Design a protein with these regions (language model features):
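Metal-dependent nuclease catalytic regions and adjoining charged, substrate-binding loops involved
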Residues: 5, 19, 75, 156, ...
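Short, polar/flexible loop-turn hinges at active-site or ligand-entry regions and domain interfaces
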Residues: 42-50, 67-72, 98, 171-172, ...
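A non-catalytic, helix-rich entry segment at domain boundaries
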Residues: 60-130, 137
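Nuclease catalytic cores
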Residues: 25-26, 30-69, 106, 110-114, ...
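Charged, compositionally biased N-terminal leader segments and the immediate start
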Residues: 2-23
Length: 265
């Protein structure tokens, strides 16, 4: 595989390569201007409590699956939590000022771990891959990659792709956006290993809900076409330097609202 640049778009051996990931795709679909700020301009953003809490929980669950099956219980996760929190503080000193009430922070993290054990029994199965990076060239100009929380392969060969969410589950009928992310991972796995995943699974620790979906070759072919179309749209936007802002309720949560042309006319 050819050498990669560290930026979202860059020149590699004389060819411009667009780096696509589920998060950057989501940015572009929600608001092309947001995509520009993050992927093209690479403007810095302060860390958010929600994102940092998600990282912490993911790291605890990753460590949990390193333990023997008999030790994968709530007590072990509870013991891992403060260790992972101290490591996070050492790696990111901004967390010290971001988290103003450490007890409340850890209590909320503990509640999410408790919810995890109410919807899954990690001592009953083996996880094959955790925090695995998958990548693939969609075209000569579009490179797709993503980090998958967990992939489980059953002794009989069935593949399950799992993603942890520390927020609450979407309302009925609004699951598609989250499932699209998992279809991207399923497509990457299929292209890399030649095996069609059997099950996509979203674990919402905020309200102890599980969303499951099967997957077919027809769906993955459709996902492939959709990704290529989105990639072409982004490449056109880059070529034309046209990233129109898209106003929505999400604007109130956007760090770049103060400089966005949609709110400064």
């Amino acid at each position: 595989m050819r050498e990669r640049t560290s930026v979202q778009t860059g020149i590699v051996r004389g060819m411009e390569i667009l780096r696509l990931s589920p998060s950057r795709i989501n940015d572009f679909l929600n608001c092309p201007q947001l995509y520009k700020y993050r992927a093209i301009d690479q403007l810095p953003e302060p860390p958010s409590l929600e994102a940092e809490r998600g990282k912490l929980i993911h790291s605890v669950l990753e460590d949990l699956f390193e333990l023997p099956a008999s030790e994968r219980n709530l007590q072990s996760a509870t013991e891992i939590l403060p260790e992972r929190w101290q490591r996070a503080l050492q790696e990111n000193q901004e967390l010290q000022s971001l988290v103003t009430d450490e007890k409340e922070w850890l209590d909320r993290a503990q509640a999410l771990l408790t919810n995890y054990f109410s919807i899954e029994k990690p001592h009953t199965f083996e996880s094959t891959y955790r925090e695995i990076h998958l990548e693939q060239d969609l075209t000569d100009e579009i490179y797709l990659h993503g980090y998958v929380d967990r992939i489980d392969i059953a002794p009989t060969g069935e593949v399950r792709i799992v993603d942890y969410k520390t927020g609450k589950s979407p309302r009925a009928g609004y699951e598609e956006k989250a499932l699209f992310q998992l279809r991207v991972y399923a497509l990457l796995y299929w292209k890399n290993h030649g095996v069609l995943p059997t099950l996509l699974q979203l674990l919402y620790l905020g309200d102890s809900q599980v969303i499951k979906s099967g997957i077919s070759e027809i769906q993955l072919d459709a996902t492939d076409r959709k990704l290529r179309n989105i990639g072409d749209e982004i490449l056109s936007a880059i070529s034309e330097e046209f990233f129109p802002p898209k106003k929505s309720k999400l604007c109130d949560w956007c760090y770049f609202k103060s400089i966005c042309p949609a709110h400064n006319r």
